[in-house]
């Protein structure tokens, strides 16, 4: 198994990445990246660019940039797609499906949910899409929370596309536990996205559902891991360690000042924490 974390750190060190990540929350956390392992990098790059991203290439690695998230594409063989892993799918907001279709992508609409649909990558990954007409985008914060950033879900999308959520399919009885874990570890805002329990971080809404079928870790799947960008990552890692987190890959700093660490949540979601991704980005879209 190749080391996608090491590759990403090398990429960030060697070359600036141009993207627009969300400003961090009080704990210094925001969404950073999705890292896919694919057989055909070029075909997948064309898909993500057609969806609305901007491509770049760094020392053999490919990244497609979106508001709030970077999509990294690494060539390799995975053990399967997101379906069957703890992270069932990811989702983006778009203004209209017609704009996506005009770019040459097919959108399968859900008849019972206006404004909700999906498109598929060349290797079969389902990417959920919500247009502004969708009725189930709203995020209601739990009592005692009033976060202005989380209110973005309750307004029309003012730009062509932005990252929206990842959806975790959890074992029975684990939804409340997962919601509490992400709230505590990353200082997230708990609430409900439509009828789903959820936790909001700048740039990402984490949705939780019970799943009767067993799931596996994201490690080695096509979506190998999620990435959060963190300010003062070393101190943040020490805080997580004090809370009992065991790191798969401990905090490491590269020559150019970027840093990373990697952990797995209690249900198998592999999460890379990075620092320096934001300072290497640009507001250019």
Region annotations inferred by a language model:
Residues 26-28, 32-71, 115-121, 167-209:
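Core segments of cupin and vicinal oxygen chelate
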Residues 79-83, 135-138, 213-218, 279-282:
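A short local loop/turn or secondary-structure capping micro-motif enriched for an aromatic residue
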Residues 176-253:
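Structured core of small recognition/catalytic domains
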């Amino acid at each position: 198994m190749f080391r996608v974390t090491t590759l990403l750190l090398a990429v960030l060190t060697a070359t600036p990445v141009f993207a627009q990540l969300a400003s961090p929350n009080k704990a210094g956390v925001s969404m950073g990246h999705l890292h896919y392992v694919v057989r055909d990098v070029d075909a997948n790059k064309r898909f993500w660019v057609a969806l609305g991203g901007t491509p770049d290439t760094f020392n053999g690695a490919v990244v497609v940039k979106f508001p709030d998230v970077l999509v990294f594409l690494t060539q390799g063989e995975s053990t399967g797609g997101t379906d069957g892993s703890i992270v069932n799918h990811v989702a983006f907001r778009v203004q209209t499906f017609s704009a996506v279709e005009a770019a040459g992508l097919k959108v399968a609409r859900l008849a019972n949910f206006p404004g909700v649909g999906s498109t598929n990558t060349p290797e079969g990954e389902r990417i959920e899409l919500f247009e502004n007409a969708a009725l189930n985008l709203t995020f209601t914060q739990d009592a005692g929370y009033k976060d202005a950033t989380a209110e973005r879900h309750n307004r029309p999308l003012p730009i062509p596309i932005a990252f929206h959520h990842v959806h975790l399919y959890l074992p029975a009885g684990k939804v409340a536990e997962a919601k509490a874990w992400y709230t505590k570890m990353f200082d997230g805002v708990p609430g409900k996205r439509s009828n789903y329990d959820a936790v909001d971080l700048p740039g990402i809404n984490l949705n939780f559902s019970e799943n009767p079928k067993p799931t596996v870790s994201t490690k080695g799947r096509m979506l190998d891991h999620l990435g959060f960008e963190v300010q003062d990552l070393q101190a943040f890692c020490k805080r997580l360690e004090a809370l009992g987190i065991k790191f798969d890959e401990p905090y490491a700093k590269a020559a150019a000042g970027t840093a990373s660490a990697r952990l797995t949540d209690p249900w198998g979601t592999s999460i890379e924490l990075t620092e320096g991704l934001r300072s290497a980005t640009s507001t250019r879209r």
